[in-house]
Design a protein with these regions (language model features):
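Acidic, Ser/Pro/Thr-rich low-complexity regulatory regions
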Residues: 1-135
Length: 135
């Protein structure tokens, strides 16, 4: 997270998570853009903040893999929609995309007897969160 975001008011992510727990679905690109605008954040800053919050909550045992993975998938779909809307030269937000990839790696059993979440997702998230300790 850059210093510009740290100097801004932190968005009320608790309200987002409360809505998600009550069954609210992130409604896509328009919702993210509206929420970002309401909190004077860029969409990239919001996607990164949400993704880091999900990763932190999952690693702290506050979210199940299924819930965290579902949110990561939704955020990735929004990232892809933005990429299509912006065309050539658009870069996916980091660490949001890396967090999506970490959860994606835990989605399927490779047949080697290991838990893919423990073997792939958790180490990747530890590395990402170590690189972003301010979250």
């Amino acid at each position: 997270m850059n210093s510009e975001m740290r100097n801004r008011e932190t968005p009320d992510l608790e309200s987002v998570f409360a809505d998600l727990r009550s069954g609210y679905q992130l409604s896509g690109r328009e919702w993210v853009h509206g929420f970002a605008d309401a909190h004077s954040l860029s969409v990239v800053e919001l996607l990164n903040a949400l993704s880091l919050a999900v990763a932190n909550r999952f690693m702290a045992g506050e979210m199940t893999f299924e819930d965290a993975d579902g949110i990561a998938n939704t955020l990735c779909a929004i990232m892809m929609d933005d990429a299509v809307a912006h065309g050539d030269g658009f870069e996916l937000p980091e660490p949001a995309f890396a967090i999506y990839e970490a959860f994606d790696a835990g989605e399927w059993d490779r047949g080697d007897g290991s838990d893919p979440v423990e073997r792939y997702t958790m180490p990747a998230l530890r590395m990402i969160l170590d690189e972003h300790p301010e979250t």
